[in-house]
């Protein structure tokens, strides 16, 4: 799995947002109401194009058989709902297909009943087993530990067989 993600990361080279000129302009920071387009993509009012969460991959809707992609999208939507859909995103880069990659957080009570605090959506999706680390070789300059956090929680989630890991490891039928 790691080799697959590494090779895919090489194919999906990223260019820092400041250096990318032919992908259009997005604000460096975007805040507002958002909803889940897929397990790793957000859309918001007055936000074009949608933002992909930096550092992760989730099953793509329409590209994979079974309900894994729907479960990943539902997990992201549940996270957004718990934060009343209020999201804060910082643009990290554009990928070679000019998709905006962003680090996005919500303020929510996780676990339920705890004090509300900021949570990185990508880290939470990986921790819950609905996404895996991808393209971690160039972390955001403001969060040098972002790659390590995602890799750490991916390892824990995989070992615990959370979310979609039994399917990804071939231990269960397609969800």
Give the positions of each predicted feature.
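Sec-dependent signal peptide recognition
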Residues: 2-9
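N-terminal signal peptide c-region/cleavage motif recognized by signal peptidases
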Residues: 13-16
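Enrichment for repetitive, rod-forming helical segments
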Residues: 9-11, 165
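Small beta-barrel nucleic-acid-binding modules, primarily SNase/OB-fold domains
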Residues: 18-175
């Amino acid at each position: 799995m790691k080799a697959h993600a590494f090779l895919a990361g090489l194919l999906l080279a990223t260019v820092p947002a400041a250096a990318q000129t032919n992908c259009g302009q997005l604000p460096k920071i975007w805040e507002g109401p958002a909803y889940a387009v897929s397990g790793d993509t957000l859309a918001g009012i007055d936000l074009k194009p949608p933002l992909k969460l930096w550092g992760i991959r989730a099953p793509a809707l329409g590209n994979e058989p079974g309900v894994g992609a729907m479960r990943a999208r539902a997990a992201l939507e549940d996270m957004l709902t718990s934060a009343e859909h209020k999201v804060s995103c910082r643009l990290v880069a554009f990928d070679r297909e000019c998709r905006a990659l962003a680090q996005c957080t919500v303020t929510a009570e996780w676990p339920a009943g705890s004090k509300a605090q900021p949570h990185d959506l990508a880290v939470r999706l990986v921790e819950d087993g609905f996404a895996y680390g991808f393209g971690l070789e160039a972390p955001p300059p403001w969060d040098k530990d972002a790659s390590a956090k995602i890799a750490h929680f991916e390892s824990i989630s995989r070992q615990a067989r959370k979310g979609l890991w039994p399917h990804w490891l071939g231990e269960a039928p397609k969800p």
